[in-house]
Amino acid sequence: MVAHARATPGHNGRVLHVILFQPEIPPNTGNAIRLCANAGASLHLIRPLGFELDHARLRRAGLDYHEFVDVMVHDGLDACLDALQRPRVFAFTSHATHRYTDTRFAEGDALLFGRETTGLPDIVLQSIPETRRLRLPMQPDNRSLNLSNAVAIAVYEAWRQLGFPGGT
């Protein structure tokens, strides 16, 4: 299921890259595997992970989609971005002021999501230009969306903007 970091923009027809920073909940990552398989995106996981990659709930959520997606595990965010040849990175956070729908995505972009419990660390957010820190609108008294739901919303918007390449 897991490959060594070797992806480049457009690698194996992958026009988008999803990066999960230190994910903690196996079903969310499993759902992201299935989503990336269906949208033709690659999935990058940044260590430490909150679970083992052979976790039963991860396999159940990803079903048999592992063969249709490039899943790569990296020791850190910099290693991941180096492997991807430093793509444009969009960080999704409830603290951003820019909406994801006001952004023009391009082939090879990387969509970065934080931990389920704490989001992205400030040091990571500060390394991303403010115009590339994006939020998904929600009701004012809510803290956040489920990670796999946020990934799905963002990936499908980016894929839509690109014209759903490879989709039917």
Language model: regions and residue ranges:
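Post-transcriptional modification and biogenesis factors for structured RNAs
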Residues: 1-168
